[in-house]
Amino acid sequence: MPPSGPQGTLLLLPLLLLLLLRAVLAVPLERGAPNKEETPATESPDTGLYYHRYLQEVIDVLETDGHFREKLQAANAEDIKSGKLSRELDFVSHHVRTKLDELKRQEVSRLRMLLKAKMDAEQDPNVQVDHLNLLKQFEHLDPQNQHTFEARDLELLIQTATRDLAQYDAAHHEEFKRYEMLKEHERRRYLESLGEEQRKEAERRLEEQQRRHREHPKVNVPGSQAQLKEVWEELDGLDPNRFNPKTFFILHDINSDGVLDEQELEALFTKELEKVYDPKNEEDDMREMEEERLRMREHVMKNVDTNQDRLVTLGEFLASTQRKEFGDTGEGWETVEMHPAYTEEELRRFEEELAAREAELNAKAQRLSQETEALGRSQGRLEAQKRELQQAVLHMEQRKQQQQQQQQQGHKAPAAHPEGQLKFHPDTDDVPVPAPAGDQKEVDTSEKKLLERLPEVEVPQHL
C-alpha cells in the first residue's frame, strides 16, 4: 500500500479539472496509522481557468473533511462528472460548510465587482464590452443562492471546469493556428514590398532557414520505448539495457502521488524538443516548440490514458508498454512543420478578416483626424473672436479716456470776456459735465454693438 500522509489527501478528477485532488485515488486513507514526517506540499499547477483560485480553495477545504475524502476515494470519474458525489456535501462537518459558505460569498463579491465594471463600461460608449464572456463568469455558481455553498454549487463547479478544460487544448491549437497564419501573412506582404532582386534574396534566405530547421536528429515518438529509454539514459543517468518501466514511472512521479499528470508527462519530452528547437537559432520558433509539446502530450494521453481522466496511473503506464506500438521505432515523430496548422482557404478567410479589421481601423482613424481638424478650426475661430473682442474692448477704453481728457480740458480753460477781460468761473468739479452730443452718441453706439456681439463669443475659461 502506498504511504499515507498529506500528499495522499487529494483526488484525481477527470479532464484535469481537479488535478489538485489526484493523490486520493492513488493513496488510500489509513486510520490509526502513526503520523509520519510531513513532506512539503507541492504547488498545484494553474489550470488556466478564470476561477482557478476559487476552485483551489474549495478543494483545499473539502479535503479536510474525513467523510467526504472517503467518498472521494470510492468515487469513479462518472460519479464525479454526473454530480453524484456532490450530494455527499450534505454530510460534511459544520465548520467545513461554514468555510465553504465564506468562500462562496467572496466569489459572489468578486463577480459583483465584474458586473459593476460591466455596467460602468456600458455607460461609456467608447468601451467595448464582451457581454457573453462576462456572463460566463457566473456559470460555476448557483445564481439562486448567493450566500451558502450547497451541493448544486459543487456540481456546477465540477461540470463547468470539466467542460472548460476539455476545450482548453482546442483553444490553444486555435490560437497557434492564428499565430501561424499571421506569420505567413506578414511574410507574404514583406516579400511583395520588395523589388525582384531583393525578393529573390529574401526567399533564398528564408528557404535556408527552413532547411536548417529541418536538419535535426530523429525525434522519437512520445511514449515509445525508444523515447523513454533515452530519458532513462540521458536524464536519469541509468543503464539503457536495464530499463524498467515501473522504476521509470516512480522516478518521474515527481510528487509521489501515484499518477503522472500533464506537467510531469510534458517534462519527459524536453530531450526530444531540444533536438528540434534551440532559442539561440533564428530559424527555431519557440511558439512552435510549445505547440509541439502540447501535441506530444495529447498523443501520449490518447494512447495511454484509457479512462480519459487526463492522468496516467501506474497500471495504465505499464499496460502501454505491452502494446506492439511501444517498441515500434518507425520513422519517428512528425513535427509541426510536417503538419500545416491551416489550409489556404483558412488563410484566405483570415486575410479577409484582417483586411476588414484594417479598413475599420483606418476609417476610425480618418474620423478621428477629421474631428481633430474640425476642433482645430473651431479653436481658430474662437481665438479670432477673442482677439476681436479684446480689440473692441481696448478701442472702447481708449475712446472713454479721450472723452475724459476732452472734458477735463474744456472745463478748466478760462473763458474770454466780450470786453477782452478774462472771466473765471467758479469751481464746479463736483458737477458732472455731459459729453458732447456727437461723441456720446458714438460711444453709446459702440457699446451697444459690443453688447450685441457678446452672446456670440464663447470665451474660454482661462480668459
Curated annotation (Swiss-Prot):
InterPro entries per the UniProt record, alphabetical: EF-hand-dom_pair, EF_Hand_1_Ca_BS, EF_hand_dom, Nucleobindin
Binding positions (Ca(2+) 1) = 253, 255, 257, 264
Motif GBA, per the record, lies over 303-333
List modified residues, type Phosphothreonine. Answer: 148
Compositionally biased tracts (Basic and acidic residues): 193-210, 439-463
Q: Provide the alphabetized UniProt keywords.
A: Calcium, Coiled coil, Cytoplasm, DNA-binding, Golgi apparatus, Guanine-nucleotide releasing factor, Membrane, Metal-binding, Phosphoprotein, Repeat, Secreted, Signal
Q: What Gene Ontology terms for biological process does this UniProt record contain?
A: small GTPase-mediated signal transduction
Pfam families on file? NUCB1_N
Q: Which domain of life is it from?
A: Eukaryota
The compartments listed are: Golgi apparatus, cis-Golgi network membrane; Cytoplasm; Secreted
Assembly and binders: Interacts (via GBA motif) with guanine nucleotide-binding protein G(i) alpha subunits GNAI1, GNAI2 and GNAI3 with higher affinity for GNAI1 and GNAI3 than for GNAI2. Preferentially interacts with inactive rather than active GNAI3. Interaction with GNAI3 is inhibited when NUCB1 binds calcium, probably due to a conformational change which renders the GBA motif inaccessible.
Tell me its family. Belongs to the nucleobindin family.
What is the name of the protein in this document? Nucleobindin-1
Q: How does it sit in the membrane?
A: Peripheral membrane protein
Q: Encoded by which gene?
A: NUCB1
Residues where Ca(2+) 2 binds: 305, 307, 309, 316
User: Which stretches hold the DNA-binding feature?
Assistant: 172-218
